[in-house]
Amino acid sequence: MLELDLQIASETSAPDEARFRLWCEMGLRQRSADSELTIRLVDENEGRELNHTWRHKNYATNVLSFPADAPDDMLDIPLLGDLVICVPVVNREAAEQGKSVDAHWAHMVIHGCLHLLGYDHIDDEEAEEMEALERTLLEELGYPDPYAEDESADHPHSDTPSKDHE
């Protein structure tokens, strides 16, 4: 079972909770244990602040992934972590890339969930593995390959900030 906490801190229209639940369950399906996940939908100001705080970049990015660092055995329901999604950025990217808004949202949520499971795209081999899994999961949901038009270019990915700030 997925315990999903959807926090809406954006004035911009976004998908409903049922869509987020579907996309999260798909992205997390390889994890058999119950899990807790928070998704916070933000506008560009908060997205920029968080990206600056955690990654020292002064712009809002599409998705930030914050994996939990508490051991599963310490919690009633294992906390996977948090996704912060900048609604205007995701909507704008969909338009700029000629993708349906729904398909791009599904991609960003699944991409963020995979980061919470430990997937990354720092090097080419990791990126290929992660992208292949994204393609498979999105295809099962009936969405097109998010990288089909972008095979030779660098792919815009969400970012996983380090929690080594303590």
UniProtKB/Swiss-Prot annotation:
GO CC terms of this entry: cytoplasm
Cofactor: Zn(2+)
Disordered as annotated region, ranges: 141-166
InterPro entries, sorted: MetalPrtase_cat_dom_sf_prd, YbeY, YbeY_CS
A GO biological process held by the record: rRNA processing
Feature: compositional bias, Basic and acidic residues: 153-166
Keywords: Cytoplasm, Endonuclease, Hydrolase, Metal-binding, Nuclease, Ribosome biogenesis, rRNA processing, Zinc
Cofactor remark from the record: Binds 1 zinc ion.
Family: Belongs to the endoribonuclease YbeY family.
Function text: Single strand-specific metallo-endoribonuclease involved in late-stage 70S ribosome quality control and in maturation of the 3' terminus of the 16S rRNA.
Protein name: Endoribonuclease YbeY
